[in-house]
């Protein structure tokens, strides 16, 4: 039997998220109103050579539980297994994002330097924009070199809310 991509919706305080799992791993946590959401779903279908089915899975239920804890300010790290789908460069950038600690921020320039490509700031920004696993791969922690909030798939309001959640002391 072919594996399918299970898909569910999660309603967060910052907006609606689309969650998807494949082979017992989370492969999507994207904002429903993200202009690139459909592109991210198509990339998964094409790469995994399968289709979506609106059905839950143990991974999706655990993701929802951990997101609930995160939004309540009771979770600083996620333990969900991830299935990343992207180019080698995107995977390199996303793995670097996973190193950004809860409550911390970094810049696109710092990410480029950390992966050994200091002149690839725009390419890094593009890879971050293609991240289909928001929050768990914390692209919201990337800000401008001047400390300004810059683009985010969930919108700047959601980005600000996520950063505020992470800077509250509990």
PLM regions with names:
Residues 1-76, 144-170:
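Low-complexity, small/basic-enriched stretches
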Residues 100-103:
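Short helix/strand-capping hinge loops at secondary-structure junctions
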Residues 86, 90-94, 121:
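Short, leucine-enriched amphipathic alpha-helices that occur as contiguous helical runs
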Residues 113:
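Alpha-helical residues within the helix-turn-helix
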Residues 80-86:
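Short amphipathic alpha-helical boundary/capping segments
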Residues 136:
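Major-groove DNA-recognition helix of helix-turn-helix-type DNA-binding domains
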């Amino acid at each position: 039997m072919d594996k399918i991509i299970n898909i569910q919706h999660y309603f967060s305080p910052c907006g609606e998220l689309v969650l998807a799992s494949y082979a017992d791993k989370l492969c999507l946590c994207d904002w429903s109103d993200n202009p690139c959401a459909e592109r991210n779903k198509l990339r998964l279908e094409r790469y995994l050579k399968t289709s979506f089915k609106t059905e839950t899975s143990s991974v999706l239920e655990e993701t929802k539980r951990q997101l609930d804890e995160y939004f309540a300010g009771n979770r600083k790290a996620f333990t969900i297994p991830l299935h990343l789908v992207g180019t080698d460069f995107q995977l390199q950038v996303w793995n670097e994002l996973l190193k950004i600690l809860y409550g911390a921020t970094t810049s696109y320039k710092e990410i480029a330097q950390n992966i050994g490509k200091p002149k690839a700031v725009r390419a890094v920004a593009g890879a971050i924009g293609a991240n289909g696993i928001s929050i768990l791969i914390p692209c919201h922690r990337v800000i401008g070199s001047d400390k300004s909030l810059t683009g985010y798939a969930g919108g700047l309001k959601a980005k600000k809310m996520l950063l505020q959640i992470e800077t509250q002391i509990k």
